A protein has these predicted regions:
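Glycine-rich nucleophile elbow surrounding the catalytic serine of serine-hydrolase chemistry
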Residues: 78-88
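Alpha/beta-hydrolase-fold enzymes
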Residues: 86-173
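Alpha/beta-hydrolase fold nucleophile elbow
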Residues: 69-80
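Active-site glycine-rich loops that stabilize anionic/oxyanionic intermediates
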Residues: 1-5, 80-81, 214-215
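Conserved alpha/beta-hydrolase
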Residues: 9-40
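Short beta-strand/loop motif that positions the catalytic acidic residue
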Residues: 210-212
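Alpha/beta-hydrolase active-site loop
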Residues: 45-67
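Acidic catalytic loop of the alpha/beta-hydrolase fold
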Residues: 175, 214-222
Length: 223
């Protein structure tokens, strides 16, 4: 799942898949949904190597699922931030899934990633990595809604369905402020998955399906 949401937000999709013969499992990433610290002010992966801990959690879920369904193929699907986590997973745990679906992913130049991470790092040292920074959040997400002006809400970019947008806004487990540390870790993850030496560590025999929305700003409108 993406930033500021959680696994059960996709329950209708899971129900559709189970009706068609699939078993569906999902976790709430660190700091999100039921994995968040009670009364936490921000979404926070933790003080050190949080991105990789999230990926390790994904592998732990895979292992538990395979124990219950040992003879069933395991497909890993990641959306938005989850797409970058899935790409990281495929590098760190090659050959442990039968196929992957990468949805709503993107690419940023090394210079942009380095610049953003430097800004987030400086802000974290000044305010604390578990704090929220409007400036850092604006650098990450500020441009997304501009393509949908005039805006009805601050998150019109999330979905072409107004009902989906309104449900997101009304959900108490969605829309929380992301910490500086989360953005710092996520940019580190994006840098990791973009490095050719890391890409070379993937199992090239694993089938991968890429899905991109033609109005999704994360993937530059489907580009």
């Amino acid at each position: 799942h993406g930033v500021s949401e959680y696994g059960m937000r996709y329950a209708p999709f899971a129900e559709f898949m189970t009706e068609h013969g699939f078993a569906v499992v999902a976790n709430d990433h660190l700091g999100h949904g039921l994995s968040a610290e009670k009364d936490a002010d921000t979404l926070y992966f933790g003080p050190r190597d949080g991105w990789m801990h999230v990926v390790d959690d994904m592998y732990a879920l895979r292992c538990r699922t395979k124990e219950k369904y040992p003879d069933v193929p395991y497909f890993l699907m990641g959306h938005s931030m989850g797409s970058f986590l899935t790409r990281t997973y495929l590098i760190r745990y090659p050959g442990t899934v039968d196929a992957a679906i990468i949805m709503g992913t993107g690419h940023q130049s090394p210079a942009v990633v380095a610049g953003g991470r430097a800004i987030a790092g400086a802000a974290g040292k000044r305010h604390g990595f578990d704090a929220h920074s409007p400036r850092v959040e604006n650098l990450a997400f500020g441009a997304y809604n501009k393509a949908f002006a005039p805006n009805r809400t601050e998150v019109d970019w999330l979905s072409v369905s107004e009902n989906n947008v309104d449900a997101y806004i009304a959900d108490p487990l969605c829309g929380q402020k992301a910490s500086i540390g989360l953005f710092y870790e996520m940019l580190g993850g994006i840098r990791f998955v973009s490095a050719q030496k890391n890409i070379n560590s993937m199992n090239l025999n694993t089938p991968i399906l890429f899905i991109a929305g033609d109005k999704d700003p994360v993937g530059e409108m489907g580009k």
